[in-house]
Amino acid sequence: MAQLQGWANHISFCADHTYVACPDAGDEFFDCWGEPSRTGPDRVLICSAEGSYPVANCYRCSLDFEGKIYPDTACIGIYALNGVCHQSANCFLITAGVTLTFEVRGYWFTLLAYGTYGNFYTFWAKFLQCSLAAGAEVPASGEIAVAINPSLPNQIRSLYEASATEVPAPSRNEMLIREAALVTRFYAPDIDPARFRDLHAGLLAAKDAAIASGLTRAELAARLNAVAAEYQGILAERLGAAVYERLMGVPAGERVDIIEPGLQAAAGVERPGSAPEGNA
């Protein structure tokens, strides 16, 4: 086992960039699509726990976009369609039983848009494959169910496994709504997710429409950031300034883009190794 640390770098007018460090493995890093600054006052340690470096190292999935390397995507798929750096960071942290928290500016919003791990089903299959290759044990569903204080990653896993028996099967967006409600209750138990469920559904519909437009790169980034700005305003009005700031990590009225300026060229662009958009 080795210590896995989730870090956040502040970016002006944008959600924090997140990455994962493993000091016990010779100061190895999972950069999560970008090139984070690892020094200076603008980085914050968000979480830290013991996990498996070999398992995380198995699914780095760096991608080559026309000669530019986007490192350590965690196989989440297509940037801005399946997730952003926050989802990749959570994938690298999963064996440590922790996730990013709402201390990360803008993380709550990317959770609403993409979930904790991007496409849970796609990531879980890759995670099991890498766990098997590394000889790591994955707890059975029954072991999770009887745990007194199951970790948030295990609660998310249980949520998705329980949905497998539903008829008709819930849509991907419905699962994102349920997952975000679970995570919100975990980190802010006094905030009722029912207060924003309808707005969450509207956000997902607007995000899907932007993706279905066929735009890519800077144009898609601009469209998604505009959707984010619109719904940030609506959510702040519904929840109130104090609650909104607790969840978003920024004051109401402060715009937080979800697509990083330095990663716009990857937005919506499929490359070998990218996963499809996700389950319906």
Model-derived regions, located:
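Charge-rich (acidic/polar
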Residues: 149-280
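Non-catalytic ligand/cofactor/substrate-binding and regulatory segments of enzyme domains
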Residues: 1-162
